[in-house]
């Protein structure tokens, strides 16, 4: 197989920095066991990822969405209504904390300032 260069892929992903991010993400997917869309030909995962992009066997838009999804730490929930189970859980936690708190001293007795 001929060497894969950035010039082979730059017409599919015009920004070289995006190309690096997408191909690195795809190489990590391949390392994780994702199915190959081209023959390996004894190439390492980054080269296979670049070949997949160059031969258009995988869409850069799909890679971009997968990359963004893998980097998100919080999943945004479109549902604005509070979840009944989480509301009950918060109430139960508040009751547990209240029950575990030390008892208060009576209002006028036993204070440090008399």
UniProtKB/Swiss-Prot annotation:
GO BP: any one term: DNA-templated transcription
Gene Ontology MF terms: DNA binding; DNA-directed RNA polymerase activity
SMART domains reported in the protein's UniProt record: RNA_pol_Rpb6
GO cellular component entries: DNA-directed RNA polymerase complex
Enzyme Commission code(s) on record: 2.7.7.6
Reactions this protein catalyses: RNA(n) + a ribonucleoside 5'-triphosphate = RNA(n+1) + diphosphate
Keywords assigned by UniProt, alphabetized: DNA-directed RNA polymerase, Nucleotidyltransferase, Transcription, Transferase
Leading EC class: transferase
Region feature Disordered, mapped onto this chain: 80-114
Protein's job: Promotes RNA polymerase assembly. Latches the N- and C-terminal regions of the beta' subunit thereby facilitating its interaction with the beta and alpha subunits.
Quaternary structure annotation from Swiss-Prot or TrEMBL: The RNAP catalytic core consists of 2 alpha, 1 beta, 1 beta' and 1 omega subunit. When a sigma factor is associated with the core the holoenzyme is formed, which can initiate transcription.
Family: Belongs to the RNA polymerase subunit omega family.
Annotated protein name in UniProt: DNA-directed RNA polymerase subunit omega
Source species of the chain: Sphingopyxis alaskensis (strain DSM 13593 / LMG 18877 / RB2256) (Sphingomonas alaskensis)
Gene: rpoZ
């Amino acid at each position: 197989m001929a060497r894969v260069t950035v010039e082979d892929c730059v017409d599919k992903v015009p920004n070289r920095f995006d190309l690096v991010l997408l191909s690195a993400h795809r190489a990590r997917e391949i390392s994780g066991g994702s199915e190959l869309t081209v023959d390996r030909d004894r190439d390492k995962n980054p080269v296979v990822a670049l070949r997949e992009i160059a031969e258009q066997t995988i869409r850069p838009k799909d890679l971009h969405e997968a990359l963004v999804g893998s980097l998100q730490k919080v999943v945004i929930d479109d549902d604005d209504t509070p979840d009944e189970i989480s509301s009950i859980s918060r109430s139960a936690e508040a009751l547990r904390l209240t029950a575990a708190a030390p008892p208060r001293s009576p209002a006028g007795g036993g204070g440090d300032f008399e």
